[in-house]
Amino acid sequence: MTAPLLRRLTAGLLILPLLFGAGCSDDKTEKPSLTLSAEKIVLPSEAGATARLDVTASGPWQLEISGSGFDASPLHGGRGTTSVTLTATETNPSTARTSLGSLHLFMPQSGPELTVSVEQRPAVAAQTLLLYMPGRSLASYFEQNIEGIRRAVDADTPGDGRIFVCWQPANQRTAELFELYYDPNSASCATREVKTYTEFNAGDPESVHTLFAELADEAPALSYGLIIGCHGKAWVPASAGTLARGALQPSDGAKEYWQPAPGAYPTRSFGDSGYEMDITELADALAALPYRFDFLLFDDCFMANIETLYDLRASVDHVIASPCEIMADGFPYDRIIPQMWTLDDLGAVCYEFWNLYQNDYASTIYRMQSGCITLAVMSEIDRLADVMRRINRTPAAEYDPNTLQTYEGLSPHLFYDMGQYVSVRCSDAALLDEFAECFDAAFPPESRLHTDGFYSAYNNRMNPITHYSGITISEPSTKFTEENRATNWYRATHE
């Protein structure tokens, strides 16, 4: 091959890759992009409140404001992520969320255009919820409950509602009140310290009434909800439960009666002696408030009890409670908090409690498949008392108390299944039908849920459930009989 021909072939080979590469090269021209951290911004109710919007762009962008009642800064930015701060210039004094306007963001060089709506929460909350957790013996579990609420709080929960917590982290003589809320700037749950009560006694009705009254001043709302998480013994007077306030010794062997079995798992029944409040005192404290709680959730043992609920019927509209002991874990707050903002969802709260202990109990601390729950409609309690009064006027049928379903491991038993008790005590079919109708109205069947058994610290074992109406009664018991006959329920149904 001659040298000129070789040079021509070599040149051709060098040119071919260059042409091939030019034909297959990628178009590296970047497409304009504009993304936002939110499609809607909701400002707090007060003037001066702020929220943040993150703008991420591939190049220069601008912002235009439409509406009034808020400002935004900066109004433009460049490549990368820029934080825009929105500031409310006025307070929204209404009871409803207000639409303030919108932000229009665009890229001048024919890029994307996006719109963000801007709203402001009302000064009067849709609902104020208080989680009241007095006492120290369950403090570590209370901390877990509070963390559960933090996990539940997001941009949608509690929405236009507000959540407050009062507990006693330091000692039994002081209390801390704080608010948990969604902070749009950090996109997470934040805490606002409200007040330290330097002198607080959870067993003093005046202290408790003051706390509840000041809550409405701090967070006025269209409706109110209350969760009480502590130890519970239903209607049993403090003097017959553990140590009465001011007493040196428990009465009538009460301390031994309420003694948990050796090695028992903790439940929300025993502890915090000397700081108990009678249910009648709680009812009076609630009734004296300038507002009424729409619901009261007892994260306590034994509170789904007719003697107890009768005392509360004029103080609250709905009650969620358990007829037996609640494991120390308590309610699954990360699951129930999103359900607590409309009365229609109270049944869902019951379901979430039951579902935890029925299906997810392995995730709880003590892994006990023990969870019973009931929803009470308090406006129906008087009607139930009326039919019970007429039942008690009829001759009592003979029955064996030992065959009745009980809900604790105490000896002698104290809490009996009310539905089963009435069915064996009354032989009048018409009255039984009327009782069943009133009972279902007061305690909707779909919200009376139970596991196959319940755990009791008083005998340190699981106990089977063969009858479940969801409500207990203490009348068949031989313990605290004089105290029981002094209850408002007994007097109202035994004329």
Q: Each predicted region: which residue ranges?
A:
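Sec-dependent bacterial lipoprotein signal peptides
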Residues: 1-22
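Bacterial Sec-dependent N-terminal signal peptides
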Residues: 16-42, 71, 106-124
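N-terminal extension/subdomain marker
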Residues: 122-221
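Terminal, contiguous helix-loop blocks that mediate binding/assembly
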Residues: 250-495
